[in-house]
């Protein structure tokens, strides 16, 4: 072997047969060819060089080197099939027999969907295939009228189809949606009630998801967690709203019970509709001017709403009528002052009757009651007063006929400003046989001097 790159070709060419013993002829032939190409003398030309010179130069490398035994390894001269087949060991399905029996190839952990579960995880449910859904379809065909399985039936179907309970419920929801779209089949409330009676786990799910898109059975387990969180929050809000509404109903019921007294519980609705206004005036007692005791006010049959327009347009004679002043001495001491009456009306003065209002010093307590305006007065109270005025006027006419001969009693009667109002009243309120005598006596006894004194007494007060 020659090493021209090292610069020692002449020392290795001499005695090559002796050095290497002719064990590797291929190597020697290659060395001779390299020396001829380089233009250097071969071993035959340098035969005169002794072997001692080579030994002295090489030193420890002059001893022959015996090649070890490489029989355990693959020979270099043969073609190695390992390198040509390195890329095919990953194509297990196409070339299953590329490796020899003695070659141990690394096997990758391959899992095939031939078993019960996929990917070797027993916790992962099986996908919805035709074999698994055929059982669900058979059940659905048998229960077309009520396609809502109970919880027990869903558990049974889940065991048979090796699916989860959520997947079975979702499959039935999708199937009902498809039936509605294809055949436009609608199921009544009976099916839903039966489903709720037996405790189905998707109560409210079919009503909520019937019109939505179909749900993927693969991701239903993950989506169910999010839906449960949303449903719990919605249920809490609904419970708070129902509790608030229930509290409002209870408070309204208590208020209505407080407003209606217990004594009015047996009355009809039309009497209860009057409310608190009727309860204030239903027990009002009116004292007669003759002092004959208290008279219970008759109940008003029909309520009437008083308004400002009605009060302004009503005639004065219908609103007030006064008894004669001669009844001042016979009034009962139980008559209260007008300010202490139950209905707090407004005391107003009509402009057309201003001179009557200014002559208030000549009025009695009963006439002051008649001067009150009906503005703001309870309708029952006003009706009772009108009835009282009618009775008092009839009694006053009877008493006036008995005392008609006494001019002293008639003189203060003429000085009262309310006497002129009584003259304007219609004559139908008093008995017809008493009017001519009362009118005749009054006209005969009235003189010019008394009229003059009446006018003079009215002027200073005006």
UniProtKB/Swiss-Prot annotation:
CDD domains the record matches: homeodomain
InterPro entries in the record: HD (IPR001356), Homeobox_CS (IPR017970), Homeodomain-like_sf (IPR009057), Iroquois_homeo (IPR003893), KN_HD (IPR008422)
Protein name: Iroquois-class homeodomain protein irx-1-B
Annotated DNA-binding residue span(s): 121-183
GO biological process: one example: negative regulation of BMP signaling pathway
Superkingdom: Eukaryota
Major localization listed first in the record, in broad terms: nucleus
Pfam families: Homeobox_KN (PF05920)
Subcellular location: Nucleus
């Amino acid at each position: 072997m020659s090493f021209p790159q090292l610069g020692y070709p002449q020392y290795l060419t001499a005695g090559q047969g002796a050095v290497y013993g002719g064990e590797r002829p291929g190597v020697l032939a290659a060395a001779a060819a390299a020396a001829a190409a380089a233009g250097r003398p071969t071993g035959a030309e340098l035969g005169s060089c002794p072997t001692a010179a080579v030994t002295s130069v090489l030193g420890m490398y002059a001893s022959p080197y015996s090649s070890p035994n490489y029989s355990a390894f693959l020979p270099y001269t043969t073609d190695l099939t390992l390198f040509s087949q390195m890329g095919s060991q990953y194509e297990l399905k196409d070339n299953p027999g590329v490796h020899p029996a003695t070659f141990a190839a690394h096997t990758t952990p391959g899992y095939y969907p031939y078993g019960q579960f996929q990917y070797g995880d027993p916790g992962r449910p099986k996908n919805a295939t035709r074999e698994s859904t055929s059982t669900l379809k058979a059940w659905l065909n048998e229960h077309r009228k009520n396609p809502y399985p109970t919880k027990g039936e869903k558990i049974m179907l889940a065991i048979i189809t090796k699916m989860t309970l959520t997947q079975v419920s979702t499959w039935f929801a999708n199937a009902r949606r498809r039936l509605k779209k294809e055949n436009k089949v609608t199921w009544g409330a009976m099916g839903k009630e039966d489903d709720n009676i037996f405790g189905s786990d998707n109560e409210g799910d079919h009503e909520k998801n019937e019109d939505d898109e179909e749900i993927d059975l693969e991701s239903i387990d993950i989506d169910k967690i999010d839906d449960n969180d949303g449903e719990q929050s919605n249920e809490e809000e609904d419970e708070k709203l129902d509790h608030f509404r229930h509290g409002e109903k209870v408070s309204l019921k208590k208020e209505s019970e407080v407003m209606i007294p217990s004594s009015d519980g047996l009355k009809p609705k039309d009497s209860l509709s009057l409310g608190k206004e009727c309860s204030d005036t239903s027990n009002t007692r009116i004292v007669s001017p003759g002092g004959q005791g208290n008279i219970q006010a008759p109940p008003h049959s029909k309520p009437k709403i008083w308004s400002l327009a009605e009060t302004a347009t009503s005639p004065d004679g219908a609103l007030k009528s006064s008894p004669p002043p001669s009844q001042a001495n016979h009034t009962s001491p139980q008559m209260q002052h007008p300010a202490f009456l139950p209905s707090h009306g407004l005391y107003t003065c009509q402009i057309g009757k201003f001179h009557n209002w200014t002559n208030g010093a000549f009025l009695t307590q009963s006439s002051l009651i008649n001067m009150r305006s009906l503005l703001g007065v309870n309708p029952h109270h006003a009706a009772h007063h009108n009835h009282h005025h009618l009775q008092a006027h009839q009694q006053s006419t009877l008493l006036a006929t008995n005392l008609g001969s006494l001019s002293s009693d008639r003189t203060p009667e003429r000085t009262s400003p309310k006497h002129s109002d009584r003259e304007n009243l219609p004559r139908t309120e008093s008995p017809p046989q008493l009017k001519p005598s009362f009118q005749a006596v009054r006209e005969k006894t009235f003189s010019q001097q008394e009229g003059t004194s009446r006018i003079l007494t009215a002027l200073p007060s005006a």
